[in-house]
Amino acid sequence: SLGGKKIIDLEKALREIDILSMSVPLTDDTRNMISYKQISLMKKNAIIINVSRGGVVNESDLNTALDKNIISFAGLDVFEKEPPDTNNPLLKNKRVLLSPHAATFTKECLENMSLETAQNVINFFNGKIEKTKIITL
């Protein structure tokens, strides 16, 4: 138990949830973490949302599960191959909502990144950044 919430294993969670929102890095442990086996455990009205990294959800298995009505819907803004091939069946699947993986393209985010970068340059020239924190190529 963590913070009063019971921790359950992934298979049990998949059987119970309505929406699976993926937000994990792509590692050896998370590659194809959600494949046909896991999807087939989910409710028929379940929705998968992957906004983390392509490769976490097996795209071929997801498309098959959607075509077989194993789950109802998917929302994706990442793909195994980016940009995705134009023949990727998920691009044409009517039960998939696609959006660009572009959270940093808002005006506010771009402005904040620009200001932070400028401040880091000023800090560097004023000796406020330790040399061990500087990455050289």
Per-range role (PLM):
Residues 45-47, 51-137:
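Rossmann-like dinucleotide-binding domain for NAD(H)/NADP(H)
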Residues 1-44:
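Rossmann-like dinucleotide/phosphate-binding beta-alpha-beta segment
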